[in-house]
Amino acid sequence: MKTIPLTLETEALARRFVWFEPPEEALSDTDRFVAYALARATHADMMLLRRFLMDDDLREALDRAPPGIIDPRSWAYWNSVLGRYPAPAMPVRRFG
């Protein structure tokens, strides 16, 4: 997966999507950051991120998404947009 550089624009996105940690930390884990983006980004936000990420990067982020970040509606939408229909099973949290 490609890294997303820290710019003024990506810093603003990181502050909105992953508000509970510094932007540098949020962007350091690309798969996790993209999972938050897939759940929370607007169309304009995704246009910005698509400057750095291709379809394969988004598919990879979906495959590696931590459980509990992407809601079912966003999961179905992004898998469909990326040519995966029906969508694979969502990530599941495991305890113990």
Predicted features by range, described:
Residues 1-96:
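Long, compositionally biased intrinsically disordered regulatory segments in eukaryotic proteins
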